[in-house]
Amino acid sequence: INATFLDEISWDIPHQNWGVEEWDRDFRAMRDMGINTVVLIRAGLGRWIAAPFESILATEDVYYPPVDLVEMFLCLADKYDMAFYFGMYDSGKYWHEGDYMKEIDLNIKLIDEVWEKYGHHKSFQGWYLSQEVSRRTKNMTKIYAEVGRHAKEVSGNLPTMVSPYIHGVKTDQVMWGDKATTVSEHEFEWNEILSNLQGVVDILAFQDGQVDYHELYDYLVVNKKLADKYGMKCWTNFESFDRDMPIRFLPIKWEKLLLKMEMARKAGMEGAITFEFSHFMSPNSEYSQ
């Protein structure tokens, strides 16, 4: 595992309420484990934002943040010689309601602001396109393409990363009655999506937790095949929490993680990010083991 997400702002994982000292200790633990890349999973979600972004404060009904988490993470990444990828703002509404241009415009303005304010950090080395999807969604590729293209243009072609999920048996939609996609359906749909993202997305890192363990290898092989076809690096996103438990979410059983790691190695993954170190793998986690 060479990378981890930084789960601020969180979607469904409880916050640990760390300050600079606690995060410094955790970045040191990451480095000691071999992690060299940290990815801010999103700049904001709905009303909550990770820093006082003027472009979002000016137009969106958001809370003013008490601290600048982006500056803190960048300073720590500088200190521990890590690469930092900046994740986009997820409105939580516009793209779900079909107003894709609003989502795009917000993030294009945010990219300009963020690069001007933080681009001097040596650790600022990439972008993460935060909106997560599992299959063809009308105009979803347009968000990835336009936001990703603009991020690369303003930053001198820094790499972009996406981490979609597989529409498998463990997704909420399928557990609520939707039908899981087969491996062949997954390949067909993502071939269409990725054909529109060639040259815009550099790292493809599918989440690995929404399919059953006996199915995972076949999906990994397809993911690698598609990434190779469209000139992308193929990473895997190891979920280090356990979807099989009745509680959302607790650390994964190490045997399960090892099984997934062996499958990823066999399938030829070129890198591995986890969601995520600080809650589910760190010696500093509130989930003590």
Model-based region annotation:
Residues 1-5, 36, 67-83, 184-213:
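Extended, compositionally biased low-complexity polar/Lys-Gly-rich tracts
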Residues 1-18, 24-28, 32-36, 119-120:
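Feature activates predominantly on carbohydrate-active enzymes
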Residues 5, 83-105, 126-132, 137, ...:
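Aromatic-lined carbohydrate-recognition surfaces of secreted/lumenal glycan-active proteins
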Residues 9-22, 30, 42-49, 56-68, ...:
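Acidic-and-aromatic substrate-binding clefts and catalytic sites of carbohydrate-active enzymes
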Residues 19-92, 140-161, 217-229:
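Aromatic-lined substrate-binding rim segments of carbohydrate-active enzymes
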Residues 26, 35-41, 201, 205-214, ...:
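Substrate-binding cleft of secreted/luminal carbohydrate-active enzymes
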Residues 29, 63-80, 98-126, 143, ...:
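An active-site-proximal structural segment forming one wall of the substrate-binding cleft
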